Amino acid sequence: MAHKKAGGSSRNGRDSHSKRLGVKRYGGEVIRAGGIIVRQRGTQFHPGDNVGIGRDHTLFAKVDGKIVFTIRGRLNRRTVAVIPS
């Protein structure tokens, strides 16, 4: 009778799904109110004028308009604003 000893178990072999984070609309683009601008973990980008922040730190447009990325303040924070059209 042919026998094969059982192989050992591995502690690898898992992976999480990608979270699709990042900038979704870039500077100069036109966006509708409610449109997502940035998906992020933490505040890599901070909300500026006419931009809201969700509880998962997603930045979204509060009004229709054009997106502007700027660096502001003493701490050189990257901010995103929407200029109403």
From Swiss-Prot:
Disulfide bonds, paired cysteine numbers: none
Stretch list, region Disordered: 1-24
MF term (GO), any: structural constituent of ribosome
Transmembrane segments: none
Sorted UniProt keywords: Ribonucleoprotein, Ribosomal protein
Statement: the UniProt record of this protein carries the keyword Ribonucleoprotein: yes
Protein's UniProt keywords contain Ribonucleoprotein: yes
GO terms (BP aspect): translation
Gene Ontology terms: cellular component: cytosolic large ribosomal subunit
Residue stretches in coiled coil: none
Similarity comment text for this entry: Belongs to the bacterial ribosomal protein bL27 family.
This protein's name: Large ribosomal subunit protein bL27
UniProt organism field: Nitrosomonas eutropha (strain DSM 101675 / C91 / Nm57)
Gene that encodes the chain: rpmA
